[in-house]
Amino acid sequence: MSYESIVGLHITNDEMYTQYRNAMTPILIEHGGGFRYDFVVSTVLKSESDKPINRVFAIYFQNKANMENFFSDEAYLKIKKEYFEDSVDAVTMISQYERT
């Protein structure tokens, strides 16, 4: 089993977001995580959110505790502040679930 989230983002700076992904991936792997799917979206046909979305991905961890530890990791938070905050305008949490 694993714990998975489907996330929609509105990315405003592709280059900086790519730097964020490159910098955070080793920390993600250390916490037993990874990306299962990753899409660049040009048209949203239906959304329950009023936030724009141009990127959708599935991120997974071995369990929910690993996810929580990753998102509170000091090294990750530093990378998030440096790259994510200025490259992403909106985050939509579409779903979170245990995958069997």
Model-assigned labels for residue ranges:
Residues 85-100:
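C-terminal end-helix/capping segment
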Residues 1-72, 96-100:
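Short S/T/G/P-rich N-terminal loop/turn motif that feeds into the first structured element of a domain
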Residues 67-89:
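C-terminal structural segments of small proteins and small subunits
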